[in-house]
Amino acid sequence: MMLQRITKPTMWPLFFTLGVYATLIWLQGFSQALGQIISEFHIALTMALGSFVAGGTALGGGAVAFPVMTKLLDIDPAIAKVFSLAIQSFGMTAATITIFCRRIPVYKNVILMALPMAALGVTLSLLYIAPLAPRLLVKSIFSFLLLCFALTLILRWWRKAHHQPSSEFIQPKMLRFMVVALIGGIASGLVGSGADIALFALLVIAYNADVKKATATSVVVMTFTSLIGSSINAWHLNTITSEINGYLLAAIPIVVVGAPLGAYVCSKVKVGHLVSFLLVLIGLEVSFTCYELYPSLLELF
């Protein structure tokens, strides 16, 4: 009986988390691992919220990490982007394992269409586009993505208020999803997030898809996009510096718990509560960006 309970798929997220903890302790030792979290407490605290958001919504952990690091902690956007992709490779992987093991519904056909183009987009972006993108432009692109996401949530709320039911089953057009996934992948290479937002927006706006099902779908796509982007950063571009490595060691123990928890909790809560929470986060981020852009706009006009 105990063996059957342990080998159930619902236990696999726990095994993944325990495996990550065991590896970190083996590599660093318990006291050093704990000390790393304390020394980078601001990053660990940021990712406590970021991982919860990543696991349970269509916003990756980078949607919290990127603005906090660039606007509050004054960390270079290039560093924040590399960190966002890397940390999502752990947190969103844990969330994806939870989604599949707990059989949280997804649009499987959409995942199969979107994954190859999102992978191509993030690869092209990291290798050829990101090195040429100005710092303020990168921040603005991220805020624009979040604004699109907010409008998508508002549209979804309006439809529900007017008793327009969501679609459990959709018939996606392949070309449309491939183009949107490519654009989302490019955005992910610039700011560490984007494939999930673009895909979620398309599902909700064009197909009136179920929000929770669309959310789980976008999390799966962003997981693989992050893994591909992080692999390029680590082994081809060599952009995982000692500074970023320190941030990761502090954040990984947090996100492998927070992301699965977010995936589980957000599959249970009312959609209205989830939407309100996300709109507050987006409003704060866009307000910070407008504040930063204001001096530049004054110079232009």
Please provide the spans of the model-predicted regions:
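Transmembrane helix boundary and interhelical junction motifs in multipass membrane proteins
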Residues: 57-65, 191-200
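Juxtamembrane transmembrane-helix boundary motif
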Residues: 1-50, 71, 77, 98-185, ...
